[in-house]
Regions:
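Phosphate-group recognition and catalysis centered on beta-loop-alpha active-site segments
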Residues: 1-249
Length: 249
């Protein structure tokens, strides 16, 4: 039985605010060897971890990341009121450099760094790429650049970046010429956008599927050729696979 690798999707998002240092640290403590985060640029082009286009859901604030400087963003906190109330009310927005420092302390961990389309739209491909690579300079060997935006991945390849992953809007987009031209190391797809049946394995690329919190679903996907599973419940999923790993051993 093939057991897929597990990716801490947005950190340990089941129990902590997503894309924050405390959630990523918790995921690593739980045993995560892979983490996934989203990156946007502040007004002064400092890369920070943030998923949404607006601040309201995560911070209960108005506006967008790229409208504020890094210094101004220090006034906001990522606490996800709808899920956690005020439990994490003082939890700051995490910079990409802070994630890099964490990765340096955990060389066994690989991070999938999603370059968000909103920042590429505002600042352009090269500005996003340059600032992200600068922030991650000490730990680039541990990082895979991923995006829905194929041109930014093509630019990374042109600069010699070692590992990229294309996020697909639909599974059949993996056949698109621009996707094939970058020879992605990883192909990401939402579980709901996969074909219901058939082999999902792709030569030359590892398939990563999100969002899965059911161990049996993960095992079925692995049987179809999926290499990695993204999950908000990293600790629970790792624990669920322990008996399977022991039986396999």
């Amino acid at each position: 039985m093939h057991i897929p690798e597990l990716v801490a999707h947005r950190g340990y998002a089941l129990h902590y605010p997503e894309k924050t240092l405390i959630g990523i640290e918790a995921a690593i403590r739980a045993g995560a060897r892979f983490v996934e985060v989203d990156v946007q640029l502040s007004a002064d082009k400092v890369p920070v971890l943030f998923h949404d286009r607006t601040l309201d859901r995560l911070c209960r604030a108005q506006g967008m990341i790229h409208r504020y400087t890094r210094e101004q963003l220090k006034a906001f906190h990522v606490f996800e009121f709808e899920r956690f109330g005020y439990k994490f009310a003082q939890n700051p927005i995490t910079t990409l450099a802070e994630l890099g420092a964490l990765l340096a302390r955990h060389p066994q961990v690989t991070a999938f760094i999603e370059l968000k389309r909103v920042s590429i739209e505002v600042f352009g491909v090269q500005a996003v790429l340059d600032n992200v690579l600068r922030s991650l300079a000490p730990v680039l060997s541990q990082c895979v650049l991923i995006s829905y935006n194929v041109p930014v991945l093509a630019a990374a390849r042109k600069q010699g970046y070692h590992s990229v992953g294309a996020i697909l809007e639909r599974w059949h987009h993996q056949r698109n010429a621009d996707v094939q031209a970058i020879h992605p190391d990883y192909l990401f797809c939402d579980a709901v956008d996969l074909p219901r049946f058939g082999d999902l394995e792709k030569a030359g690329a590892k398939v990563v599927v999100y969002e899965v919190t059911d161990p049996q679903v993960a095992l079925k996907l692995a049987k179809r050729g999926v290499s990695l599973i993204e999950t908000f419940a990293i600790g629970e999923m790792l624990a669920a696979f322990e008996p399977v790993r022991a039986q396999k051993a």
